[in-house]
């Protein structure tokens, strides 16, 4: 797991509801994809990693970075394909405003799945639904799984999240769905 926050002075990540005040050096659209592609390059040097079967997954702001990274126009890679970039991306409850960079949608170069709660109190599930619809209209293989009543961080295993029935239901569905997605796209 790449830690783009700690080395840049944010060892605990961002405080909740701080989207508009985050520093440029942690921009999820222009900087964090570079971290992801740096990690990909490193992983491909390892003998214990199958170099052409690496996927990307992120949660919250990391999910936003995942969406930007999976774009065919992401910084850090030229003309990406599933063979040269990541095989797939999985984004759990991203903020889909993406600094206004993808107002017309994202055309991912590999399949992307987005999991979001309809009652997310931190970022807009409506905005993600709009982004996914625009991205699909561009021909992107991107799908949204919207969980009724689930909140931001619905898959957090703590009782404070899992005692909420909608969060628990979403978690029980999302985990096997994520495993099945990655199993399908990462098979030889």
What are these regions (language model features)?
Residues 1-45, 156-162, 169:
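Serine-hydrolase catalytic machinery in alpha/beta-hydrolase-like enzymes
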Residues 1-2, 58, 144:
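Hydrophobic residues in well-ordered beta-strands that form the structural core
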Residues 7, 97, 153:
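Active-site loop signature of alpha/beta-hydrolase-fold enzymes
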Residues 26-34, 122, 126, 145, ...:
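Soluble non-cytosolic domains of exported or imported proteins
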Residues 26-108:
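Primarily recognizes the serine-hydrolase "nucleophile elbow" in alpha/beta-hydrolase
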Residues 35-38, 42, 130-131, 173, ...:
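Alpha-helical elements of Rossmann-like donor-binding domains used by nucleotide-donor carbohydrate transfer enzymes
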Residues 81-146:
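The feature captures the conserved acid-bearing segment of alpha/beta-hydrolase catalytic domains
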Residues 141-188:
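C-terminal catalytic histidine-bearing segment of alpha/beta-hydrolase fold enzymes
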């Amino acid at each position: 797991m790449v830690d783009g926050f700690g080395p840049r002075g944010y060892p605990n990540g961002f405080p909740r509801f701080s989207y508009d005040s985050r520093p440029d050096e942690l921009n999820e659209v222009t900087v964090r994809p570079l971290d992801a592609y740096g990690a990909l390059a490193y992983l491909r040097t390892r003998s214990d990693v199958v170099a052409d079967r690496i996927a990307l997954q992120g949660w919250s702001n990391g999910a936003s970075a995942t969406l930007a990274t999976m774009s065919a126009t992401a910084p850090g890679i030229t003309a990406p394909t599933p063979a040269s970039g990541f095989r797939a991306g999985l984004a759990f409850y991203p903020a889909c405003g993406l600094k206004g960079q993808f107002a017309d949608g994202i055309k991912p170069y590999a399949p992307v799945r987005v999991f979001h709660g309809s009652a997310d109190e931190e970022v807009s599930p409506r905005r993600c639904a709009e982004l996914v619809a625009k991205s699909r209209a561009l021909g992107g293989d991107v799908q949204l799984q919207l969980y009724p009543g689930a909140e931001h961080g619905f898959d957090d295993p703590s009782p404070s999240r899992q005692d909420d029935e909608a969060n628990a239901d979403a978690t029980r569905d999302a985990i096997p769905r994520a495993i099945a997605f990655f199993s399908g796209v990462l098979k030889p």
